[in-house]
Amino acid sequence: MITLITGATSGIGEQLAIKYAEQGDTVIACGRNTQKLAKLGKHNNIETCQFDATNLQDIKAATLGYTQFDRVILNAGNCEYVDDARNFDSALFERVINVNLLSMGYCLEALLPKIVSGGQLVMVSSSVTYLPLPRSEAYGASKAGVSYLAKSLAIDLTDVDVTLVHPGFVKTPLTDKNDFPMPMAVTAEKAANYIIKGVAKRRKEVHFPYRFTLILKALRILPLSLWLKIAKGLTR
């Protein structure tokens, strides 16, 4: 099995690369950080591929030598919070949309044609898409786009299985900067285990940790006006 993973230089992506390699897959670990890629490349069964996921031509050039993949995991992403919605920062919004959503489109154009018939496409979104949360205007909008994109692809792709991943809080270098509590947060290693298990079963959606995501799913039955009142009361 040949598995390509974007955002493989840290967090969930790094753990996925290591674990799939340990299972015997040939892993193409992709990212921008050459030093971290070099470290990953020391593992057996891991090849590295350096590119910027927000640059279509960069992706195409870097992956030109690869003709097919059994599994592509689009995991690259970033998070920035809107601290002052009244003075909306469009540059911040553009950065987050570019990294989290537009990069998906670029990767799909470059990589989807190379996924073998019967292969798998895995797209990592976020459980933030279940409900609107404070300061998440940019991050939530970008991940909501990813979720809708994955669901539509699951309808239109007839020979590739699509798995949409909705993680809860995961302890990674990205979330280390969060200045608020992260209930039921799991390690990146545990998150990778959830994803690998769900992907192996070709689930349409993988969400975790289950208790946390099921609570969020249940809260969606509330009237929007009531949820907005609750959300306004959440601490920063």
What are these regions (language model features)?
Residues 9-10:
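Conserved glycine-rich cofactor-binding loop
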Residues 23-38:
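Conserved glycine-rich Rossmann-like NAD(P)H-binding loop of the short-chain dehydrogenase/reductase
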Residues 43-57:
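Rossmann-fold cofactor-recognition segment
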Residues 83-85, 89-94:
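Substrate-binding pocket helix/loop in short-chain dehydrogenase/reductase
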Residues 108, 142:
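Active-site helix of classical SDR
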Residues 164, 180-215:
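C-terminal helical subdomain
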